[in-house]
Amino acid sequence: MKKKFLIVAAALIGSQLSAQEDTTVRTLDEVVITANKFPQKQSGTGKVITVITKERIMQSGGKDISQLLNEEAGIIVNGATSNPGKDKSLFLRGATDKYTLLLLDGVPLNDPSGVGGSFDLRLLSLDNIERIEILKGSQSTLYGSNAVAGVINIISKKPVTKNPQFKGLLTYGGYNSFKGNANLSQKTKILEYNVNYVYNTTDGISEARDTTGKANFDKDGFTQQAVQTVLGINVTDKFKFSPYYRFSKFKGSYDAASFTDAPNHYSASLSNTGLTSQYIYKNGTVFLNYGYDFTKRNYTSQYGEFITNGKFHHVEAYTNHNLSKNVHFVAGLNYQSYRIDAPDTTNSILSPYLSFYFKCAKGLSAELGGRWNHHNQYGNNFTYSFNPSYLVHNNLKLFVNITSGFRAPSVNELFGPFGSNPNLKPEKSNTQEAGLQTAVAEKKLEFTITGFNRSINNVIIYGFNGYENRDKQHDYGAELEAAYAVNKQVSIKINYAYVDGKITQKLSTKDTTYYNLIRRPKHNVHLFVEYNVNKNLFISSSLQVTGKRIDNDYTSFPASQVDLNGYALWNVYAGYSLLKKKLTIFADIKNITNKKDYYEVYGYNVQGINVTGGIHFQL
């Protein structure tokens, strides 16, 4: 498989090297906001950050957010190519999803009723997202609990026109899948608004795999609806506040287990509301944000109905302030509370934090910060970050990150109905990163190389007596991201990720250490070729190569380990714009070779070839 991939890659690259016109890639000049909570060029921060642009999202009309994230270096979304309604598990640099913090416009998303407080990606729609910033490595100093492996900041679309603008999307594809999206927005001097609605439905496929081909497993469909309303009110040219309300719900069917059909049903809903505000003063900006998430889940099976409710409050005030041309700081205070209804229990955490950014000399910069956390149950803990970087001739950035992080035990783990333990302590991590980012060949070729090492102590596991702090997790790996602008029309991008890890079980008799990255490949590669044929026609092709993995076979007791073969998926997209780009017709073909002889999860189906056609339009 690796040999075939290299041959394809060489052929694709070689066929384009004779192109005559030059262009550049400009990732180092790209402005991001997630790295340090203020706008900053990537060349000025030592943190590892990847941006999914609005153009890339626009060209993903046939995908959902899990499939888009699954294309990024170091990210595996297990379930992205399985039944559309199947639960999704996000792994960032080998860490499970409870160690990655999701933000929506800078405000955390959290479901206290979920396992480990993890947020369900199926509650998010890709259709009102402007861009996504992926910040890798421990970020607990600025973002608090769960930001151990990294932070993913989902940034919603903003109004851009003085007159009301209506945009829409209609798609139809395989498995009788339909999606419709409508968006109305306007931006004036005083008021701006963005109203969005999406409806998405599919018949899907059977979640469980029928190895006999004769059992006639039923299809497990999925339906999602989401609405969003965001207002922006400019009280003065220095003070602005934005109330928002988002509601999302989905329902569908799921099967009993590996290779086992069942008429089970599930539903979930999210009410997400709050307020963001900012005040600009002479040397900086003050922000005050509030967010509230209410998540409800309902599972119905032969064992009856199971309902969970989770409520999450987030209040944060912070300022970014310029002390001088070369010294900048961010200082803030954050309060969060987590509540479940069965039993009725609330946890809270209060955290002041401070981070300094220094431009020490020409090309040299550093970030140094700390965060103190007071939890109403376990007490206090502290995290720190140190991120020096050096920019050479504006085209080579060298960086080192030395950080600590933490994950507070969830309210479910502390006081939930199953195996809870009120004496749990926070999981604590230490992460080291080093690498370089550079642009060469007149900035036509840009690449980033990063190595990381992460250890997590006091890992919370579910043992014979319920939840307990017991084990130690150690993960390490490397990532490569490269982009080459062949000419003004053709670009080639590739990313590669390697991750390895092991857990040390601290048992009463002796410690046991073994590889435990279930469903995560050691090697993962994505290759993209993009071709702007002319000002109206865009074509892209991508190849995903996923290495072999391990999983557990739960059809036997005790569960036994099974090997999952590696696989390669080839996708093609084409879009054609009309009427001064107010109308775009597109086709998205996923898994063009119809490969179905692999598993993401042992015993569960994957999608074969899936053709989606659709239109983007604006009035």
Label each region the model flagged.
Residues 360-362, 453, 470-554, 593, ...:
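Gram-negative outer-membrane beta-barrel transporters
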Residues 260-276, 280, 377-378, 387, ...:
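Outer-membrane beta-barrel signature, preferentially recognizing the C-terminal barrel domain
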Residues 66, 70-108:
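Extracytoplasmic beta-strand/coil segments of soluble accessory domains associated
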Residues 65-68, 88-91, 100-103, 119-124, ...:
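N-terminal periplasmic accessory domains that precede
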Residues 108-136:
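Short acidic/polar hinge/loop motifs at secondary-structure boundaries
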Residues 153, 161-163, 171, 186-266:
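Periplasmic-side early beta-strands and strand-to-turn transitions of outer-membrane beta-barrels
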Residues 30-58, 89:
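N-terminal periplasmic "start-of-domain" segments of outer-membrane beta-barrel proteins
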Residues 6-9, 19, 233-234, 400, ...:
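Conserved C-terminal beta-signal and adjacent last beta-strands/turns
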